[in-house]
Amino acid sequence: MGLPFHYVDLRAFCYATEDEDRVRDALRTVLPPDAAIEAAEGEGHHGDPIVILSARVERSAEIDAIFDRLRESIDIDRVREELDERLDGNNAVYVGLDKQAAARGEIALGEGITLRAKVEAYPAKRETALENAREALR
């Protein structure tokens, strides 16, 4: 039985000063090997071009593999303790990952990559989602 997540989204911005392939590789550090990464063109605060790289993982085994890697690499107890702040109004858990570390093939808490995991909760109430997420992150 898989973890109680509908899907996991990963997103990173690639700024004009960054190599897009390097940012893709950073995402691949967290993603399953065959995950498709989509690119969308955007514009930064000052009008500079930005490429938004994103991927969605929906298969249970792949979601489990992502969380297994997170458990091995980051302070998962900290994430679990901070769930109340990390869970949004749509019952999605957010975890920021260090883009520079991921570019080196490592996974660490930080900034640059946003992981969003939509928690299964029936009924779709915050308390149920928190309980399910806490259990999943053990």
Task: Identify the meaning behind each predicted range.
Residues V23-R28, I66-I74, E131-A133:
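Short amphipathic alpha-helices in soluble, non-transmembrane regions
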Residues I37-E62:
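Short, charge-patterned binding micro-sites
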Residues V95-R138:
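Glycine-rich, aromatic-bearing surface loops/beta-hairpins
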